[in-house]
Amino acid sequence: MIEKRTVCQIVEEWLEDKDYFLVEVTVSPDDKIVVEIDHAEGVWIEDCVELSRFIESKLNREEEDYELEVGSAGIGQPFKVLQQYYNHIGLEVEVLTKGGRKLSGVLKDADEEKFVVTVQKKVKPEGAKRPQLVEEDETFTYDDIKYTKYLISFK
């Protein structure tokens, strides 16, 4: 069986001096290898082909047959690595907490422990007849959430 660690090392070698970053590598028991990469400005098919060929040049099909799939972390898919949070600062995201609360807002900040989303809430000021929209920052730790993903808007 092909080791995940081996594939990760090969991908990291290809990533040197490139603006891409590794999102995930999975290797199934039947040696299906799936590599997900991402880039702040999107992933180009030519680069996926180049990475695929690079991986194939480092693995020996004569020793062990495998299936290889190289692609981008899909738009609208949950974030898997911190770099995805950094790349989406200033953009709208959707968050689902482990408590089942779903909200959307603008990703304001992120670090290794937490991230901040600016959400709009309706608040009725004292003496006012109607509620007003107010922006409020909500902070989450990564352990508090089921997922965060880029919110695709067609407005």
Curated annotation (Swiss-Prot):
Gene Ontology cellular component?
cytosol
Which cysteine pairs are covalently linked by disulfides here?
Answer: none
Biological processes, Gene Ontology terms: ribosomal small subunit assembly; translation
Q: Which Gene3D superfamilies match?
A: RimP-like superfamily, N-terminal
Keyword terms, alphabetized: Cytoplasm, Ribosome biogenesis
Record's InterPro entries? Ribosome_maturation_RimP (IPR003728), RimP_C (IPR028998), RimP_N (IPR028989), RimP_N_sf (IPR035956)
Q: Where in the cell is it found?
A: Cytoplasm
**What does the similarity note say?**
Belongs to the RimP family.
Q: What does this protein do?
A: Required for maturation of 30S ribosomal subunits.
PANTHER family the UniProt entry points to: RIBOSOME MATURATION FACTOR RIMP (PTHR33867:SF1)
Annotated protein name in UniProt: Ribosome maturation factor RimP
Source organism phylogeny: Bacteria, Pseudomonadati, Bacteroidota, Bacteroidia, Bacteroidales
